[in-house]
Amino acid sequence: MNVLNPENKLTLYGQKTPKVVIYKHESHKLHQAFNVKEGETIVQGMAVALHTDGTIKPFTGASGEIYLGIAVTDTKTPAYAGQRAYPVEVTVAVEGYVLCYWAALTAVTPGYVLPTGTLYNNRYPNCANTTGGAESKFIALAGASAPASGVSELIPVLCR
């Protein structure tokens, strides 16, 4: 008995299903939601980069851009629409294997950071931005102001 007839296109009613943007992906990839830079459009399957304010934008390969990963949701049909003064979020399958909370030893901007080898409160690794934005395996996903009276902010850091 033939289960599949090669002459049959398997479309009995309607139209052929259009191809999806993301065909297959590893289910164990790390996903993270990001706010989208105002005025930018992100679509599913698009490569995205970290903007200097911690939001994401389309990756173009321009000098200094920090590639994060591939968008798995989009701004056209977001899972959660922007509400009140809160922007639209897009989920990204990031190029990394873990997200950690590190302490900002100094004022930190979103971008490449390095651990300093010291701990904050005997628990969180301290970090600081790399010199001149040099690439590293660690990316601060949010910024932090300069610590006041020895109290550091915890910031999410993507480790590649």
Model-assigned labels for residue ranges:
Residues 1-160:
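Glycine-anchored, exposed beta-strand/edge motif detector
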